[in-house]
Amino acid sequence: MLRHLVCCFVGPAFLILSACQEYDFKVNDKIVYTPTPLFRDYAIPDTGLNDCVKQAINDGTVTTAPQLMSLDCSFAGIEGLEGLSIFTGLKALRLSANQVRNLVELSKITTLEAVYLDDNKIIDPVPLYGLAGLRDLDLSGNPNLQCPKPGSLTQVASTVLPQHCR
């Protein structure tokens, strides 16, 4: 009888609770579980980038800045990257087909391993030179890019440059 009670009531209760991870849970009017709030302590002026980061935080239930490890903001109309460096855990960043020009903010995210900046308006790749962990880099489709000097991206295993830099 006890086994039947456990199977019929306790098991489904735990199943329901696991689906309610975003809500306070009360027993006898006492809160027994409060979820950690999502990370919101950042300021990103670019609307496209801000919306993309907000969505990534919601999708990944990110509660601290370093927890955001991957971000895909392709085709988002992004022009500026200011404020992105608060996400110190970023390893993969995809910003394909935007209007990005300045990469200084990326130089502060030393955890980056893969950066896709194809089809933007980048001119100066120098801020990427100091990213020691960078392994994959795509700068194709940036017609005004100042071609990286030989040896400046030796740490990068895979580099895709615009046609005029090949």
What is each PLM-predicted segment?
Residues 1-9:
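Bacterial N-terminal signal peptides that target proteins for export
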Residues 13, 45, 158-159:
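Residue-level signal for mature regions of secreted extracellular proteins and peptides
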Residues 21-23:
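Bacterial signal peptide processing site
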Residues 32-34, 58, 63-101, 105-166:
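Concave beta-strand-loop units of leucine-rich repeat
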